[in-house]
Each structure stands twice: as C-alpha cells, then as structure tokens.
A protein has these predicted regions:
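C-terminal extracytoplasmic interaction modules
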Residues: 1-387
Length: 387
C-alpha cells in the first residue's frame, strides 16, 4: 500500500474518528501505519498510509551518571626511603644511580609529589605515580654472613608497610639474573622462597648475601627494625647529578601528609666507589722480602666470568697499600697492579716503628677509593721469624 499525499480536505461533521496522524494496523500488511490523509469515495473512505517508525528509543531519557566522589577511607601517610645503589653494569659508570622508594600503608593513596632539597628550599622533581614501592622493616635480627655462597637454610622475617603487597619466589636461575633483590640496611640480599604469615609479615628463606659488593654490611648483620626495600621497577629514579647547593635529602608530599616527608639519601657515592679487593695473600722469601698480592674486582661485575678478566671500569688500575689507620696512614705505597713487594730492610724498619700496625690495600678509582682490605699485621710477620 503506497503512501500518497492529498491536500484541500475539508472538515466534515460526520468525518471518521480516525484522521491524519492516527496510528493503525492495515489488514494484510505487517507493522504499524500512520494515516497521512483520507478521502470519501463512493465505495467508502480511502486512507493514505505511511509506515510508522517509532521514535521511542531515541526519546528515552539517558542516565547522566554520577560524579566521582572519594572513598570513605581517609588518605594514608606517605612512606619514603632514598638511596644510592652500586653500579649495576648498565648505563654510564660515572652517573650515580639514585632512587626513591615511595609507598604507603594499605589504604587510599594516589602517590606523592617529590622534591629535592636545594639551598634550604624544596624544588619539584616530579610525581611518584600511584604505584607503591614494596618496603618495610626487619621483624627480627639478620645475623652476620660472609656472603660467599647461597645459604639455602638461612631465614629472615620482614614486615611490609602495605599488608596488601605480595612477594614472589624465584629459582636459582632467576636469582642469578638479579631477581628478588632486597636492600636491607646497606646490604643487597636476594631470596628464593617467601611465605606470608599475615598482616604484612613474611618469612624469607634461601638467601644470597652481600650482593653488589655489600659484603662489609653482610659481615656486620642487621638489627630488628632495619629498613627493607624491594629493588624493582617500582622505584622512582632520582636526578643523577646533584645541583650546586643540593643536599642529600629529598621530600615527598601526598594527599594524606600534613607536612613534607623527608629522607636522607643513603649510601651517597656508592655508585662510583670501587669494590673492596678480595683474596689477600702474603709470602715471605728466605731473604725476608714480603710479597703481597690480592684480587681486584670491578664495579658492575655481579658475576665471575670464567677464563677472562673482569673489565676494569676505572680509567686506570691503581692501588694504595698503607700501614696503620686508613684515615691517617703512617706509610703509603702506590702500585699499578694487584701486588707489591717490600724488601726485608723496609719490613724491619716498619716493625720498629709500630709492631701492632697492619698493612692494607684499597683500589684508587676514577672518582673514589674502595674500602681497605686487611693484608697482614706486622705482629704476624714477627711471629713468622720466631724459631
């Protein structure tokens, strides 16, 4: 039934109740139709119809949504720790690798704005982002360790700031590639297994201690309450090169902080400091000459490759052998290699001056000197001469 349009229809008193605009159904035709016009015929009333398309869907009211309102929980305070790490072998060896661990206890926290301290003012660094670093404290003491081998039975318990945070186990291959590194105090520790005990308390077992040249801290051990931070991509890199007038403190301010949260940068200068030499050896010949030897290490050398020397990293290989207090040595010798020979007469003269003093060695790097390695004490040399 084709729709058609007619004009000039006059109103009639006996006109049908159905008029233009009415919605009807037509016999033999599916759907709804709208009357557009009608006309009297000798056989009845002729209607002009057009298929009716409902606009109800377009006219239905839409939901405008609700404005965002913050959760009922109050914002929690920011936790901040800042530190400098040993060079990991990536990037430039002369650029300090400094990081901020920005986190918070469980609760509403959207990150914090970071600042560096410069001439008693706070200069913005950037925003930490909402991702929290994983950190906390030691729940019990961590005893000293030589850090020579993987300690499968060693255990330690830590308490995380955020009880919703999780740790993951790692196999030995993953540990060899650097997984599961923790900064406990100033020591880098890797762990293999972890077991949650509830309320943020975790027991870690299978430890590899003194990583990255931190064996001095491993030998000292750690008391309960020492800071613990997981070293992963949730850390925020800090500006590498300090500006003139900058201090060793940074600050963080989050929504739940009434005042800036301040943190000293721990282990400042560690990235550019050479590692402690190892394996001291001494040998005295029949004439009384003393040969001192040691093994050098290199920054960024986390592994011991077989058959090749570690890259030097420093501009030159240079060592200082000293006698007495490393801060105020009585004598000092410079040598370009990991060995030094002292003649018998010189040894005798040293013994007369201070028999209780000791000989030590440290590597002199491009930017700093390494911690000193004990070689031998003069009293031990005197005992060797005794019949």
């Amino acid at each position: 039934m084709a729709a058609r349009r007619k004009a000039g229809v006059a109103d009639e008193p006996d006109r049908p109740a159905l008029g233009p605009g009415s919605i009807v159904r037509a016999p033999g035709h599916a759907g709804l139709w709208q009357i557009t016009a009608w006309e009297w015929r000798d056989t009845g009333i002729e209607l002009d119809l057009a298929r009716y398309a409902s606009l109800a869907g377009a006219s239905q009211p839409a939901d405008g949504g609700a404005a965002w309102s913050p959760p009922d929980r109050l914002p929690v305070e920011t936790r901040l720790r800042a530190f400098e790490l040993p060079w990991d072998g990536t990037g430039q060896s002369s650029v300090p690798q400094r990081y901020a661990a920005v986190s918070a206890p469980a609760g509403r926290w959207g990150g914090a704005m970071l600042y560096r301290e410069s001439a008693d003012t706070l200069v913005p660094i950037g925003h930490s982002g909402p991702q929290r670093a994983v950190g906390g404290i030691l729940a019990e003491a961590l005893p000293p360790s030589p850090g020579l081998r993987f300690e499968a039975t060693a255990r330690v318990r830590v308490r995380l700031d955020d009880y919703e945070a999780a740790l993951e186990p790692a196999g030995l291959d993953a540990i060899a590639r650097g997984s599961n590194r923790l900064l406990i105090g100033g020591e880098i520790v890797q762990f293999a297994q972890c077991e949650p005990e509830g309320n943020g308390l975790w027991q870690l077992c299978g430890l590899l201690r003194g990583r990255g040249g931190t064996e001095i801290e491993a030998l000292a051990g750690h008391e309960p309450g020492a800071p613990v931070t997981l070293l992963d991509d949730r850390l925020v890199p800090l500006p590498a090169n300090p500006y003139p007038g900058d201090g060793d403190r940074i600050a963080a301010i989050g929504a739940g902080d009434d005042a800036p949260v301040l943190a000293e940068i721990e282990n400042s200068g560690r990235t550019c400091r050479p590692l402690l030499p190892v394996h001291p050896r001494s040998e005295q010949d029949a004439l009384g000459n003393l040969a001192l030897r040691w093994t050098r290490r290199a920054r960024g050398g986390w592994s011991w490759p077989d058959g090749v020397e570690q890259p030097l990293v420093e501009q030159d290989e240079l060592y200082e052998v000293g006698l007495g207090d490393p801060d105020r040595p009585a004598r000092i010798w410079a040598t370009p290699g990991p060995q030094l020979v002292l003649e018998a007469g010189e040894i005798a003269a040293l013994g007369e001056s201070d028999e209780g003093a000791a000989l030590w060695v440290r590597q002199k790097g491009s930017f700093a000197v390494s911690p000193p390695l004990h070689l031998i004490s003069l009293s031990t040399l005197a005992e060797r001469k005794m019949p």
